[in-house]
Structure formats: C-alpha cells, structure tokens
Curated annotation (Swiss-Prot):
Its main location: membrane. In elementary bodies (EBs, the infectious stage, which is able to survive outside the host cell) provides the structural integrity of the outer envelope through disulfide cross-links with the small cysteine-rich protein and the large cysteine-rich periplasmic protein. It has been described in publications as the Sarkosyl-insoluble COMC (Chlamydia outer membrane complex), and serves as the functional equivalent of peptidoglycan. It is present but some of the disulfide bonds are reduced in reticulate bodies (RBs). Permits diffusion of specific solutes through the outer membrane. Residues 1-22 form the signal peptide. This is Major outer membrane porin. It comes from Chlamydophila psittaci (strain ATCC VR-125 / 6BC). GO terms for biological process: monoatomic ion transport; regulation of cell shape. Belongs to the chlamydial porin (CP) (TC 1.B.2) family. It is found in: Cell outer membrane. One of its GO terms (cellular component) is cell outer membrane. GO terms for molecular function: porin activity; structural molecule activity. It is a multi-pass membrane protein. It holds the Pfam family Chlam_OMP. The keyword Chloroplast does not apply.
Amino acid sequence: MKKLLKSALLFAATGSALSLQALPVGNPAEPSLLIDGTMWEGASGDPCDPCATWCDAISIRAGYYGDYVFDRVLKVDVNKTFSGMAATPTQATGNASNTNQPEANGRPNIAYGRHMQDAEWFSNAAFLALNIWDRFDIFCTLGASNGYFKASSAAFNLVGLIGFSAASSISTDLPMQLPNVGITQGVVEFYTDTSFSWSVGARGALWECGCATLGAEFQYAQSNPKIEMLNVTSSPAQFVIHKPRGYKGASSNFPLPITAGTTEATDTKSATIKYHEWQVGLALSYRLNMLVPYIGVNWSRATFDADTIRIAQPKLKSEILNITTWNPSLIGSTTALPNNSGKDVLSDVLQIASIQINKMKSRKACGVAVGATLIDADKWSITGEARLINERAAHMNAQFRF
C-alpha cells in the first residue's frame, strides 16, 4: 500500500507539472517540514512534552511566493435584461426612429451567460508564516499583482447608435439619443497595471501516519489594480484607451453626456478592478526523503468587479470633416441613403459608442492541485505546484525557517 501511495503521488507531481494549468493549495505537510532554524535551533514540536514551552511552540518562516494563473475559467455576472437602450432598428430602408425613447421592458442582455476567452493573473510576493507546534501555520503574503482579460464584445455590452438622421456629430438633438444596437462580433481585451496585493491564510496537518500527511488550508486574497490599457476591436468601432476613465452608478445611465469620450468629460472615475478570492483546500502528501510530493483538491471563488463602469469611445470635442470618431461608414457611401435635406450624412456610422466592464466571477469552483516540495537540511524548502480544471496555473514557493 505504501509503495502504491508513493508511486501515485510521485507520478501526479511530476507528470501533471508538464502541463501547467488563483490561489495555491500548498503542501499539507509544510508546517512540519522545516523543523530546524537557520538562526535558532529547532525545539520539540510535541505539545505533550512536559519540558516544552511556548517559546518552543512558535517559529517563523519567510520566503518568496509566486503564483501565475495562465487561464482562469470565468464568466460575466450580469442580469438577464439590459435597460436604457432604444429599440433595435428593423426597417429595411430609411432611418431609425424613436431613438430618444428607451424600450419599455428593456431587452435581453447580450452579455448574459457569456464566458471569458482568456483570464490571466500573476502575483509575486513576500511570504511570512507563523508556525505553532510544527503542526499549524498562519501566514500572509504582501506583494504585487497584474492581469489580462479577453472576451467577446458581447460580454462587455459594446453598444452604439446607428441610423440616426443627422448632419452633424454634435447635433443639438444628439445628446438626447440612446444607443440602439449591441455589437456582438468583436473582441475586447484589457490589461491591468501592477498593483499592491495581499493574502492571509491558515494551513494545518489534520492526520499523520508514518510519512503520510493529510492537511487542510484556507486563504483569502485581495487586490485593486486599475485598467492600464483597453482595446476594443469590431467592424463598426475600433479604439484603444490608455488608462481609461468612465461613468459609474447613476451617471452611467443612458444617455451619456455628449462630452463623454472627449477631453472635456467630467464626473468620470478610474477603471479599477476589485479582485477578491477565497479558497479552502484538502491535500495528501507522502515524504520520500528530501522530496515530498502531494496532491489536493480546492474549492475557490474569485470575483473581478469594476462597478460596471461604462467607458465611452474616445472622440474629438469638435468636428473635423463632420466627424468626431474614426468609425467607418458601414455601407461605404451615403449616396444610397435618402438625402433628407442633408441630414443623413452620419446615419450609416456608429455613434455614441461605449462599453461596460461587467463583473466577472468563477465559472468552475472545484480544482485539482499537484506539486512537490524539496527540502534541504530541514531549514530550507522549495515548492512547485500545478493546478487544473478551474484554472491552469503554476505556483512556486521558496522559504526558510529562522
């Protein structure tokens, strides 16, 4: 039985690490692996020892913590209906009508049920653990994190106004108009800046038998990075914004101010992503001399919330050649449209385009982790871990005991 357990753990730790897939599970035996210190000699870890004192019971470890999520499985968290837009134009010819009146009961939300195509999250931090009786760890990390996210434009409610009869991009009645189409055939991606992040957690050995250890852990992590670069690519509208700002709360309701997207826009907020994640895990390890492979399962929930900030397409504050954006003419020429006394110059161009950064959350909660810890002189250790199913991630931890 011992040989079978050794083989299974060693195969999982080495074989799965070749296909690296939020928070690491960690080695369940980690609290009891480093029993000697680089500065102070280790003491008995037995609470039943009559000679033991509280000074013997407590030790401190420090080191490096690196966690790299290459593909987190996320979905957008939105309502089934989307309100504030005008009716979708359906007529074959002419112009859109009633674009200043919202649909009575809203419309089906094109973002509902959408999945993220790619979600990456990288963290580098300092690690500090308080150990009790060589059985339990209370630890924290302090460092920096940054991310990258990509999805269909439908997942972020890219909308605009098409078919509106106007000769000027800053027509006096344009500020009262509402977007009437949602753009689904496009891609939205954004990068966050590198921002301060932290986490806290606890890990303990629940059961030990010979060289085998069964342990559990709990962690919570948080960070608030800002969007550094937003890139929107679609046929009707394409734009890139460095350090985007937008509208939150009541100010994000349609219609947006006519100055939205210009340098004169007011009441805008930074696009900050509020990242929160918690996790519980259970893992089994088996010590093979200096190598301690392990396998575990975790249950985690992560959210990335930007307060549904709405960001307008950048545009000029005054017209140049009757336009304020570089959006293309969708039919290539306005000569095929009714002239309407020259008011249909812009009716085939997407106007007042904007995008909403919707809340994202975990689509799969359960995951599997495999890894191994290499120990040197019971004072130093290096741990490598790979995670699968709910994310593809790799983790590295190097630490020493004082």
